């Protein structure tokens, strides 16, 4: 009975962890009106980008380590850019909006996971 309960707990944790990893970003290139298209980023793209060059607006999934002007300019093949990268779901709505703090959200999920695992491990001891 105890082994079965442990297995169910591990299965539940695996499901919860896998659903919390995927980042969602707005994904539009120069929308005519407000961007409403969003997509789930692949695991190697861990940030959302909003970049503005003149009237051109780019909103897409991005790699946070590549979030610098030099890389963005070369990748998007543009001459100048204002940009912002953020790491929370749908945080790249527009350039003017303040981003949500994805780091706090990630820290909270990690703390919850660690607490749950420790509780499951220590429960048989008490």
From Swiss-Prot:
GO molecular function terms listed in the Swiss-Prot or TrEMBL record: complement binding
Covalent lipidation (GPI-anchor amidated asparagine), chain numbering: 101
Disulphide bonds in the chain: 25-48, 28-35, 41-61, 67-85, 86-91
Keywords: Cell membrane, Disulfide bond, Glycoprotein, GPI-anchor, Lipoprotein, Membrane, Secreted, Signal
Topology term for the membrane: Lipid-anchor; GPI-anchor
Signal sequence extent: 1-22
Domain UPAR/Ly6 residues, every copy: 23-110
Keyword Metal-binding belongs to the record: no
GO annotation terms (biological process): innate immune response; negative regulation of activation of membrane attack complex; negative regulation of apoptotic process; negative regulation of complement activation; negative regulation of complement-dependent cytotoxicity; positive regulation of T cell proliferation; regulation of complement activation; regulation of complement-dependent cytotoxicity
Record InterPro entries: CD59, CD59_antigen_CS, CNF-like_PLA2_Inhibitor, LY6_UPA_recep-like, Snake_toxin-like_sf
Glycosylation sites: 38
Keyword NAD: no
GO cellular component, one term: extracellular space
PROSITE patterns in alphabetical order: LY6_UPAR
One Pfam family recorded for the sequence: CD59
Subunit structure: Interacts with T-cell surface antigen CD2.
Function comment: Potent inhibitor of the complement membrane attack complex (MAC) action, which protects self-cells from damage during complement activation. Acts by binding to the beta-haipins of C8 (C8A and C8B) components of the assembling MAC, forming an intermolecular beta-sheet that prevents incorporation of the multiple copies of C9 required for complete formation of the osmolytic pore.
UniProt-recorded name of the protein: CD59 glycoprotein
Species whose genome carries this gene: Rattus norvegicus
Lineage, highest ranks first: Eukaryota, Metazoa, Chordata, Craniata, Vertebrata
